[in-house]
Amino acid sequence: MTSEAVRRVQSGSPWEESFGFARAVAAGDRVIVAGTTAFKGDMLYGEGDPYEQTKVAFGTAVEAIAEFGLGIESVIRTRVCLAHSRDVDAVGRAHKELFDSVRPVTTLLVVQGFIDSRVLVSVEVEAYRGAVDS
């Protein structure tokens, strides 16, 4: 694959600059979105609310795939990392509201924690340019 076949999008997160990564990368038919939280700039949305943090984080991820001309119907995989297993119902509810009509494969993990202890959820998304309903 040539470098011309790979495109990158930044979201403005300070961590992208600090750690040297892109919010999303398109390579061929795949678009992969990096771990995304409810931070926008230096502000955390939905502090203490895993449902709201999930919605905001997925919103940012969907904005990233939109930069490549894709919508939510193109999402084929999500991965959700939770700080607390007690939040699984709230996070699952937010995920279903967004993806019920799409039904991507999904992995939910409980992790030890995040860089900022106020973060309750981090999400990853993978989209496919050739996604179709079945």
From Swiss-Prot:
UniProt-listed InterPro entries: RutC-like_sf, YjgF/YER057c/UK114
Pfam families attached to this UniProt entry: Ribonuc_L-PSP
Superkingdom field: Bacteria
PANTHER family attached to this UniProt entry: BLR7761 PROTEIN, YJGH FAMILY PROTEIN
Name under which the protein is recorded: Uncharacterized protein SCO2049
Originating organism: Streptomyces coelicolor (strain ATCC BAA-471 / A3(2) / M145)
